[in-house]
Amino acid sequence: MTASSAALRTPRQRGAALAGVAMAIGLALAGCQSGPYEPPRFPFAPGFKAAGRSVPVLLANSAWWERLGDPVLNRLVAHALRGNPSITAAQARIAQARAAFAATPRAVGLSPGAGLSLEGTDGSDPVASGTLDLGFSWLLDPYGARRAERQAAGGRITVAEAETDAARLALIRAMATAYVDLRFSQRRLALHEQEMRNRRQTLAMTRTLFAAEAATRLEITRSEARLAEIEAELPLRRAAITARQNEIAVLAGMAPGNVGLLGVDLDMRAGQPRPALSPEVGIPADLLRNRPDIRIAERRYYIALADLGQANAALYPRLSLIGTLSVTALRGGRSGAEYSFGPALQLPAIPGTAARATVDGSRARVTEAHAIWKSTVLGAILEVENALLDYQATSASAQASDTAVRLYAEALDLTRKVFAESNATLGDLIDAEQALANAEQTRADMRARRGQSFVDLNTRLGAGSAGTAPETPVALQQQSG
């Protein structure tokens, strides 16, 4: 139900009196405004359990991928952040949210208008007239309806910005993962080619021994089978490399097969990326606030509270001051003006009806948003704890695999010397070569897993997600304490 004053065309004193009454009512209702927003809090521990006794120390490491020490990867990430369509789409969503915020009405509004008309009848000259209208409205907002509406719109801007950060982080993770896997695939291909050369040498040696009646036909057949086995795997290794190169091109915003346009040589078999971060790393748990998904969940809780504020405000009367001024000009210099000014009171619906149900629904959404925020935080803590454990485990495994390769290489050298002195069989030599080949494959796998766990750890922390911040505290190092 709405009760509004008629258009006032009385002396200005009466309009001023009504305005004073409206102002008094507004001031009387102003005490009902809600308090300031309190963000949700989580009892973060000083650090993660997987970090042990390491002292948490922050490092400026927003570009954490640079710590893999590979300039090609750095260039690929830069290409992806400039050319990937997902970033463009996310930035467009920010623009949409900002436009929606700008379109949200304010407490004070002006609505100008103008018109020109030409009227006449048969046998008479047309009469031209012009009008200029100016409307004015001022909403007294003691219950914060308009304020809550703008807060919700502003919160959606922050959500869109955090979603852009999430898209940026996902893109960096995908590019780093694809690059680590590419170098691993190239390393595996190189190892298979080296093993193929070794098996050919062994086969030639076996045939020489067979001619000297120092080897059997069975040993030749086994050597040929081992060579055929490794040759069968080579096409799969090469296909895996091409697939990763195509993935990298698409992540950089280009069609598959156009990776050469990026200005980097991905066919060159560079070494596998090796992170320069100690496995004994200390990380403060509240660093998780950097994660875009946590920021999104917190802002959605903020929006839910703002929506609840709007629903609550709808239960109470809305008082506004409205006014219009209309000026009409006729041909011949004649003109006239009309104006109106006064309060308008909009009463709420009957309590206990749809408006109250809307409040109940909004309150339930606040509870839901808070629960989602808490669940997001708990999930983030779990992910970082497991990422820390995985990084520590893969670092230890990679170090052990280096030792294994060194020892198996020494064993192969000794076996060759003993074999040359006829104190070892051909089978012993083949076994020693196979053991070294397996150890080198394991080392390549461990290095790839360590590189991937480094990527996972930083992305689980939300590192590198803020594209506009020059320095984001992310990676950490141990200090003696």
Predicted regions and their residues:
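Terminal intrinsically disordered/low-complexity segments used for targeting and assembly
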Residues: 2-10, 16-82, 238-289, 458-481
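Mid-chain, structured segments of secreted extracytoplasmic proteins
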Residues: 81-101
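Small/polar-residue-enriched beta-strand and adjacent coil segments characteristic
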Residues: 34-35, 63, 71-72, 76, ...
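Short histidine
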Residues: 425-437, 467-475
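A short glycine-centered flexible hinge/capping loop motif at secondary-structure junctions
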Residues: 210-214, 419-423, 460-464
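Heptad-repeat amphipathic alpha-helical coiled-coil interaction surface used
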Residues: 94-96, 101-103, 118, 150-152, ...
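Periplasmic alpha-helical coiled-coil/stalk elements that build and connect Gram-negative outer-membrane
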Residues: 146, 162-283, 390, 394, ...
